């Protein structure tokens, strides 16, 4: 009986830790000054749920202490329009690591959310692959591009090197933001 309890406990602990998000290595070519000058991007692909992530746009502006990003969501779920804005403020580099930083996001209602992020790949102009991790639970990886349609060759190269299949991710192509079915 003790063995069954021990194995069950170990299984629960393993599952709990498997769901924890761990930041991946950031892009070596990350340049904060240039990266945070990209004014407007679309989330074109999302690895995990919620699929509504691909219906978002990011508008970033520099501030004295870092940057502020306004994330705008525009989509319809079963005919019901959802339009909201979340303001995220960069609170600095994570452990001094270039390409990794902490952000505090304030949704329209409710408490602020703190995330740690890692820019996995970028050309600092047209695209970025951004990993975001909440303080607990599973994170997500997003493809951000200045072009609403298509896939930048740099994104394709990164996915190929990682052995990832972009066609298996949620995208603006396979998620209809005007009529999302739950």
Swiss-Prot record:
This is Triplatin. Keywords: Disulfide bond, Hemostasis impairing toxin, Platelet aggregation inhibiting toxin, Secreted, Signal, Toxin. Disulfide bonds join 21-133, 55-177, 88-105. It is found in: Secreted. One of its GO terms (biological process) is symbiont-mediated perturbation of host defenses. Residues 1-18 form the signal peptide. Expressed in salivary glands. Its main location: secreted. Belongs to the calycin superfamily. Triabin family. Inhibits platelet aggregation and vasoconstriction through binding to distinct eicosanoids involved in inflammation (acts as a scavenger), and has a role in inhibiting host innate immunity by impairing platelet-assisted formation of neutrophil extracellular traps (NETs). Inhibits platelet aggregation by collagen, and low doses of thromboxane A2 mimetic (TXA2 mimetic), and arachidonic acid (AA) without affecting aggregation induced by ADP, convulxin (GP6 agonist), and PMA. Binds to TXA2, TXB2, prostaglandine H2 mimetic (PGH2 mimetic), PGJ2, and PGF2alpha. Coiled coil: none annotated. GO terms for cellular component: extracellular region. The keyword Ribosomal protein does not apply. GO terms for molecular function: toxin activity.
